[in-house]
Curated annotation (Swiss-Prot):
One of its GO terms (biological process) is medium-chain fatty acid catabolic process. Acetylated. Could occur at proximity of the cofactor-binding sites and reduce the catalytic activity. Could be deacetylated by SIRT3. This is Medium-chain specific acyl-CoA dehydrogenase, mitochondrial. The active site is at E401.
Amino acid sequence: MAAGFGRCCRVLRSISRFHWRSQHTKANRQREPGLGFSFEFTEQQKEFQATARKFAREEIIPVAAEYDKTGEYPVPLIRRAWELGLMNTHIPENCGGLGLGTFDACLISEELAYGCTGVQTAIEGNSLGQMPIIIAGNDQQKKKYLGRMTEEPLMCAYCVTEPGAGSDVAGIKTKAEKKGDEYIINGQKMWITNGGKANWYFLLARSDPDPKAPANKAFTGFIVEADTPGIQIGRKELNMGQRCSDTRGIVFEDVKVPKENVLIGDGAGFKVAMGAFDKTRPVVAAGAVGLAQRALDEATKYALERKTFGKLLVEHQAISFMLAEMAMKVELARMSYQRAAWEVDSGRRNTYYASIAKAFAGDIANQLATDAVQILGGNGFNTEYPVEKLMRDAKIYQIYEGTSQIQRLIVAREHIDKYKN
């Protein structure tokens, strides 16, 4: 098996270097008019999906429970994912990356999340941290900070949330004061994924001291090296689920950042920070679908083996109907993230679809994890079976990268604006 997997890796890396890149340039991703809608994946997409699936089932699943128990950061798995080309997929080709689209990243993310969403979140945390630079960085910034991530398995982090500012991003208190050719950063961030493992951070700070300044002018986005003096990394938080993911608070005390590390310019940070979500929320939704699919598979497997009242569980209509509902929900959630990803890869603004996908898939992941525990009964409540972990892991999909309630606000706003305009 090891030899076979090794050959698969070499083949995939070959595809990554040649065929995949040639097939997925921006020019080639443009669809010819009149071709209609298609559910068919390209051969390269199938290769990436199959490799991620094999990796999740053969390397992640066997150790997921132990990582959940210890809370240890899954360094060997992250290194392996990097070797397979399953990380940093958004990084442009001119920076050494594959330059893949959001749809491609979603296919990989779903498979990784099927194995363990803690591992998937650590990897997706990288994508979120990178995205502001991908969409707003200049050539020098991209080559310096994105390029290094293709040379070795480094991590980065999206450093925005604060103790008193989660959904209310405009309420952040971290300040950036310009002094000569550098900025002095002071403030505190919280719930930062990869916070203790990152090589660098995307940081959002208030650069306009006027409290009445509009959000689209009051904040500036920075790239901050993690080893800069004045950065104090807090303890690893013990969370309800996704425990192998690294989540921390970070204090910035008189941290000096050169002006060369500003994205676009003063006051552009809020737009940059929010713009990243159109590309990352579909990928988060795909992770939620991966968890939901795992819950459905575990529940179905159990129902085909367990007997009660002289019958298999699947022979009881109550259980078969539950499985049918679960199957319908996971299929619809998958379609939602694929639509959102397809829209942004086609060059269109996808805020509406990205929020639908994020909210719907997050809710479905929680519903299916709960139903899986119910079908397994007492066994589902026990750590000997994987569904209790799925139930704990699922909750964060309704919280991070925009709560389900915030997504509904966005969907409502976009929907109403269509009719007004």
